Amino acid sequence: MHHHLNTLYQGQSLSRESTRDAFGQVVRGEVDPIVLASLLTALKIKGETPEEIAGAAEALLAEARDFPRPDYEFCDIVGTGGDGLNTINVSTTSALVAAACGLKVAKHGNRSVSSKSGSSDLLDKMGIKLDMSPAQARHCLDKLGICFLFAPQYHAGVRHAMPVRQALKTRTLFNVLGPLINPARPTYQLMGVYAPELVRPIAETLLALGLKTGMVVHGAGLDEIAIHGPTQVAQIRDGEIREFMITPADFGLETYPVSAIQGGEPEENRAITAAILAGQGTPAHNAAIAANVAPLLLMAGKAADLKSAAAEVLAVLASGKAAELAARLATLSHQEA
């Protein structure tokens, strides 16, 4: 480890292999907390490279609990959190809606980072079991087209870094790792990041990790596609990254103020999500979900463009199909596979 630290102290970047080695030691609990604090701080001050982020992600995936990966195509929709704007749970709600649209979704999530309730806080409130075994989760994915993978169930080693992360009280490499370490390893992915300068590096990281199709987005201050302004996109397709901007108009949607998708406490967010899933969401809530599910339909080849994809999502929302799916998931999640 000290060899890796000396490289960083000289202002140089670590290779992917070196970072993989360093973070392998971290998640195995072999690194003294003071040394770990130095590692995270040195990386942060230098600025983490895509190779370093990929190496750390590979280390965590290598130590993760196995998930029985299916041979069909499936996706994840996830944000880093940490945008500080406390909006409704767009990615969690979108995951349920995407499944209601016929996609297969294995969503990786954790307790809250940015909103008052993260994906796990919301699922808990909806009666969906968080600590499903990998076999149970796979059963839900096969039968219903959706499962939720609760990060601590798969990445137990990350607990070794928790005291240091809490003591540092600043963002570190761990803040961007969560969305990159889905143990199911989805075939395509929509990932939101909390800062515009992360869009390109995280897309490069996903490409380095072998993702074939995906989008990394930052929406005017949010770690998701915005309905209140433009969204910066880095699209991964056929081994290449293309960068562009999209606006609500590209989806055929109105523009709304960000206050229209303000979130609340876990119970309030559960009520908001329940209303959206049942076809009783506000126009702004529905638009936020449509904008974030539409790219997944496009990536899956189930829509020709963003406008027709968003229209399909709005139709599924109006049908209340997603509420039915959430209720079935709550029941199935408590049954043995």
UniProtKB/Swiss-Prot annotation:
Binding site for 5-phospho-alpha-D-ribose 1-diphosphate: 79, 82-83, 87, 89-92, 107-115, 119
Keywords per UniProt: Amino-acid biosynthesis, Aromatic amino acid biosynthesis, Glycosyltransferase, Magnesium, Metal-binding, Transferase, Tryptophan biosynthesis
Database matches in InterPro entries: Anthranilate_Pribosyl_Tfrase (IPR005940), Glycosyl_Trfase_fam3 (IPR000312), Glycosyl_Trfase_fam3_N_dom (IPR017459), Glycosyl_Trfase_fam3_N_dom_sf (IPR036320), Nuc_phospho_transferase (IPR035902)
Gene Ontology terms: cellular component: cytosol
Reaction equation(s) it catalyzes: N-(5-phospho-beta-D-ribosyl)anthranilate + diphosphate = 5-phospho-alpha-D-ribose 1-diphosphate + anthranilate
Cofactor(s) named in the record: Mg(2+)
The protein's Enzyme Commission number: 2.4.2.18
Positions that bind anthranilate 1: 79, 110
Enzyme class, broadest EC rank: transferase
Subunit structure: Homodimer.
Reported function: Catalyzes the transfer of the phosphoribosyl group of 5-phosphorylribose-1-pyrophosphate (PRPP) to anthranilate to yield N-(5'-phosphoribosyl)-anthranilate (PRA).
Name listed for the protein in its UniProt record: Anthranilate phosphoribosyltransferase
Organism, as annotated: Aeromonas salmonicida (strain A449)
Gene: trpD
